[in-house]
Amino acid sequence: MVIKSSSQFRFKRRLFTTALIIVVGIGIFITLTNHSSPATPVTKTKNVILMIGDGMGWEMARAGAMAKGYNYTSGKGEGLSFQTLDNYALATTYGTTIAPGNGVFSTGNSALSNSISITGASPMLPGFKFQPQFNPGDKPSGGGKNLNPNAVGNLVGYDPQRGGINPWTPGNDPEYIKYSYPDSANTATTLYTGVKSYNNAISVDIFEKPLETILKTAADHGKSTGIVTSVPVDHATPGAAAANVNRRNKYDGDYPTLDNILQQELRIYQPTVILGGGHPLTGASSQPLPTGVEPPTKFEYITKTTYAELSKNPNQNRYNYTFLERGKDAADKLGTTAAKLDPNMGDRLLGLYGARGQEGNLPVSTANGDYSNTGLSIFSLFGSQGKNPDTVRPLLAGETDKSFIAKEINENPTLDDLTKAALAVLSKDKDGFWLMVEGGDIDWAAHDDNLDNMIGTVLDFDKAVKTTIDWIKNNGGWENNLLIVTADHDHYLTLNPNFYELLKEKGPEALTAESDSIKAGHFWGSNPNIKSGWGNHANLPVPVYYQGKGSAVL
């Protein structure tokens, strides 16, 4: 997974053994290196914690550190909790690209015809044969040329000459990293299974065959498992740890269907702890609500029938989970419940949260940590190409912005609260645990080109990292625990040389509202003259920070 040289490409695959619980799956990236390292003896680690800042590339981590007063221009950096970990590397994130009958390659295609929506049910594309050559294409979705499907390869690849040997050294083609960029489903699949696949894939290979995830491997070895996220629990990154479906938007389905993420999480994989967003009371509204009108519900991430089963039977439901949801004093209730549950007795915890107007996510933290943007549309800034974000919340009659924010903060835990609760439950397992914690809203802020929200969500994620590091120090230390902090993919953010000074002078909120890229000190995309020229991912290597028992094999 480490980028050590640009002179030669090779594949590095880790063997799935008992020791895989240490490796976590993150070490199975296709890498750039010019030498082989000797085999490293693998020893058993009790607890493995993987923390993913969704979309948190090198520039985003640097912006977060700068907001705390630390300025650097290369390397690991300092100022954030995850930057205190002993080890640092870079990992590529690309996936596959496949052309169907029309000959146009796309990163979103499997090797099946997709004539049947059920995972794995469609026939294979006629004449398809996997070709391992690199094929970045010339469009964001991949391909773009009418070519014979077997004329070029099915791996996107990464060229350090075009993209840069590292994130702080630009390559010679600023458009290149837009081409065939990965999505969170594809990259999460690789993180959890060690297999490259296509955008949209939730732990299935290019033939839509299910892959064994590290969560399942850990469970098979008697360990408790957990999924924690600031976005919906059946979104791509958490979903790929505990489901196998061909499309990431298969969030939930009515019982007893299983070709969806949430039902597989709850009925097949059954992690000990599932905590995150996706509550139906988070539907966005473009205007305040009149007297007598109930807050909008949006059953996108959970069906009405699934929610009814859980909410009406929080302690005894068909899924055998203790169910918590957003409500008064949510963080306190979560902590109290977590303290009572014991995985050795078969207890499991499911918590579903989300702020009104946040499209399923927890209250969003701004750079100063005041959650002042809670309830505002997450996708307003980039969509308006540089104008100020939306200022309208789905207020109830008589509710003010101040009381709205206070209510949402009270009725929803933070990512840090969720992490503490997960550790409280999982740490009771005498055999140890595997836990994934995702700062998913970092990615949402970056899609919006919203610097203020992006820095805030990075710092929010870092609080959870600090909590985890402190927990490790007090629970067996680094001799019993392994912590890996990384991103699943990057975004196309560039900080100008004057960014640090402008950030100190004007603050992130002002730089977010500024439409001129020079005055804003940053821009999104390949054109330095356009501040909001891109609102999507980039095919750049991402940082990996890690420390603990078993880290030598990474």
Language model features with spans:
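Ser/Thr/Pro/Gly-rich low-complexity linker/stalk segments immediately outside membranes or between
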Residues: 34-44
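Hydrophobic alpha-helical membrane-insertion segments, chiefly the h-region
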Residues: 23-32
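Glycine-rich anion/phosphate-binding loops
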Residues: 204-212, 255
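General structural concept
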Residues: 199-207, 227
